[in-house]
């Protein structure tokens, strides 16, 4: 009975609403004044390639590539490290850049990088960025003894956030030099923290043609002030040490992470080529943060789950019927591969209105 109840619970996590992008009703977004926060002067990287003999896939040559970051990215050796799934097929192919959830879960990026490569059968090149080091070391920040150490720790974390965004832009520089990559069809996908990073990259780099943001948001200071679990542990520990209330904490991160807010780059996104996946009961990304990202990106296509922050990831598993994975793949097929807009999507048809499954 316990197993049956568990399967029923997990299977229920496939319920969601799929909303189409409506260009007729979308409002024109004013172009923001853009500070050059994510600018850089480093040349296009020339990565070292290394073999991955036990990670090969049919239709691909899978190898590793790495090069020094031009910033301080907090990753091992201060390197940019990625797995490159290069198609064996002739001709220029699109590139999908898959972002990690730094120093946290590898499951979502593993499913998308390996799964989409196999799904397309060699019609897309895939670059899976690695992320073994944290951007925000929650436990280290939680243990700061005083305000000076707190400022230093947050400054370093925000610097790493900016650094990995620049690392991604330099991966795009590299992609433009590759004869097998069609650099007019570059997509990016991020999850949670990397959805936030990815949205800042897309808002600053017009070479990003297609973007998927899974369980991300804007207004990162609200996330810092309201997210649960390890972020809440850090917040409570620091607040006790510094004798701050929640609003002081929120105000501090509003200043420190002002350039990490995707809403700054409104008017720079391509809403017709953007997919947002969110949870209406997300206990890490507040409602105002979710709404701000949706509005800043031009009210694009959106999938909404009625769950918390982690439950939609269950829809990327066989128990959850891979519903979320299939929706993401179908969107990428349409945008990167030019599949027909009216292609049937499993058990539902995406229309100009809303479709609920």
Segments predicted by a language model, with ranges:
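Short alpha-helix in the alpha/beta-hydrolase fold that links the catalytic acid
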Residues: 111-114, 272, 285-295
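N-terminal cap/lid segment of alpha/beta-hydrolase-fold proteins
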Residues: 43-90
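Gly/Ser-rich "nucleophile elbow"/oxyanion-hole loop immediately N-terminal to the catalytic nucleophile
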Residues: 148-192
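Short beta-strand/loop motif that positions the catalytic acidic residue
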Residues: 269-270, 275-278, 282
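Short beta-strand element of the alpha/beta-hydrolase
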Residues: 81-82, 92-101
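C-terminal catalytic histidine-bearing segment of alpha/beta-hydrolase fold enzymes
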Residues: 291-357
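Cap/lid segment of the alpha/beta-hydrolase catalytic domain
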Residues: 103-165
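Hydrolase active-site cap/lid region
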Residues: 200-248, 304
């Amino acid at each position: 009975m316990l197993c049956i109840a568990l399967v029923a619970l997990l299977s229920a996590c496939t319920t969601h609403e799929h909303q189409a992008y409506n260009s007729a009703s979308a409002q024109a977004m004013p172009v923001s004044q853009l500070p050059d926060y994510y600018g850089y002067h480093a040349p296009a990287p020339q990565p070292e390639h290394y073999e991955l003999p036990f990670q090969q896939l049919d239709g691909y040559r899978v190898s590793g590539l790495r090069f020094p970051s031009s910033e301080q990215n907090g990753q091992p050796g201060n390197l940019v490290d990625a797995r490159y799934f290069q198609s064996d097929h002739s001709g220029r192919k699109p590139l999908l850049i898959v972002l990690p959830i730094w120093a946290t879960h590898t499951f979502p990026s593993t499913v998308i990088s390996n799964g989409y490569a196999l799904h397309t059968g060699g019609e897309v090149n895939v670059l899976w960025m690695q992320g073994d080091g944290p951007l925000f070391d929650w436990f280290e920040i939680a243990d700061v003894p005083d305000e000076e150490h707190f400022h230093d720790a947050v400054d370093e974390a925000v610097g790493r956030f900016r650094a990995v965004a620049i690392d991604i832009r330099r991966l795009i520089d590299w992609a433009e030099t590759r004869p097998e990559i069609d650099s007019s069809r570059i997509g990016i996908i991020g999850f949670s923290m990397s959805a936030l990073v990815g949205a800042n990259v897309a808002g600053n780099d017009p070479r990003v043609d297609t973007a998927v943001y899974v369980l991300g948001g804007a207004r990162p200071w609200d996330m810092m002030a309201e997210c649960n679990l390890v972020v809440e542990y850090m917040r409570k520990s620091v607040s006790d040490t510094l004798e701050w209330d929640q609003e002081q904490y929120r105000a501090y991160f509003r200043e420190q992470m002002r350039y990490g807010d995707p809403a700054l780059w409104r008017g720079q996104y391509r809403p017709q080529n953007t997919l947002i996946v969110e949870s209406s009961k997300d206990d890490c990304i507040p409602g105002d943060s979710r709404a701000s990202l949706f509005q800043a990106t031009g009210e694009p296509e959106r999938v909404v789950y009625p769950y918390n922050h982690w439950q939609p990831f269950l829809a990327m598993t066989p128990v959850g019927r891979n519903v979320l994975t299939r929706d993401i793949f179908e969107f990428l097929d349409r945008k990167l591969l030019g599949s027909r807009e009216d292609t049937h999507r499993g058990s539902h048809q995406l229309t100009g209105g809303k479709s609920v499954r």
